[in-house]
Amino acid sequence: MNLIFTCGGTAGHINPAIAVANMMKERFPDCRILFIGASGHMEEKLVPQAGYELKCLPGSGLSRGKNLAALKQNIHAVRCVLNAVKACKRIFREFQPDAVIGTGGYASFPALQAAQSMGIPTCVHESNALPGLTTKLAANKADKVLVAFEESVPYYKHPERVEVVGMPVRREFIFTDKEQARKKLGLDSRPLVVSAFGSNGAKVMNETVAGLFRLEKEAGFPFRHIHATGRFGWEWMPDLVRSQGVDPDAEESIDLREYIYDMANVMSAADVIISRAGASTCNEIGACGIPCILIPSPNVTNNHQEKNARMLADHEAAVLILEKDCTPQKLYDEITALLSDGPRQEQMRRRLREMVRLDAAERICDIVEALCKR
């Protein structure tokens, strides 16, 4: 069996594909797997680290603007897509895939388009309740459209091809032991807080966390804190933290990283997670059952992150803070209130696990296997 996974841009598109690829490899050890993504993005780090071959093609996303710069950007994007489709066809003729699986991001469109034009079975997975542009375009000719939420089904032209499967997460998010995870990180007895705001980072939230570090220092560092700056915050955030009176190189209570590559282990060790509210992140948090504070990005299409966060908050499975309301003091107060309330933490763990489908990767594998047998 030969499978191609296509995804890219952010970890939210890449990690679900890796979760399914891992499950397929468990079932079929001889299965050949190839990933196709876009040059210059997170897939160049995450996919090889997961042990899979990756081919990256030049790509560019579409602009939703209406000015001349946006027009030029979109002309460039279309040219990139056309060239990438040709490149994918060459790859397919050599690799001979039995199916192509897309998990979102503009990087996945050329491979899906090429596969559909060559009669290769395709399957797309959409993690958000409202489908993204790539999913909308690819879904019309896809053999199977897999969604995380029942509410998503009416948005597709061919509902008979749509199946609700949930959101795939890697098995290590489900089965990693908390005490073993803490031991691996060398933690002391203090609680662990983990904060991350997407693989690219978020300037506003990095600034807020820098202020939060100052409050933690003033309180005598009552908890350990691991923070991921993201790709665009790594160069400048350490200096900002120093300006708050905290030396990130010398202070052992804080651990500043560009990206948390061992997220399953770090998340499993955590007592509180602070993050955005992308569907992939919410499901990973749910699989671990870790009390969380969600600060949805206000800069995403259809405001889908706030909808994700409100759904969890309405079920008392998360604390929701809008970015515009999130100050260092408010965030510190929410963290300490949560850490001091054991019954509330336990309730959040229970509610989170109730809302997550832990068999999503297995269900997707069943569907992919059936496609390959056609």
Language model regions located:
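Conserved nucleotide-sugar phosphate-binding/catalytic loop shared by glycosyltransferases and other
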Residues: 3-10, 26, 30-83, 165, ...
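Active-site-proximal region of nucleotide-activated glycan assembly enzymes
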Residues: 32-34, 53, 116-178
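Donor-nucleotide binding loops and adjacent catalytic segments primarily
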Residues: 46, 64-65, 178-183, 187-272, ...
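A short helix/loop element that forms part of the nucleotide-sugar donor recognition site in Leloir-type
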Residues: 73, 174-186, 344
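Glycosyltransferases and closely related glycan-assembly transferases
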Residues: 87-100, 108-123, 136-141
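Acidic donor-binding loop of glycosyltransferase active sites
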Residues: 97-99, 260, 264-281, 290
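A short, well-ordered alpha-helix in the C-terminal region of glycosyltransferases
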Residues: 344-358
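C-terminal alpha-helical cap of glycosyltransferases
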Residues: 357-374
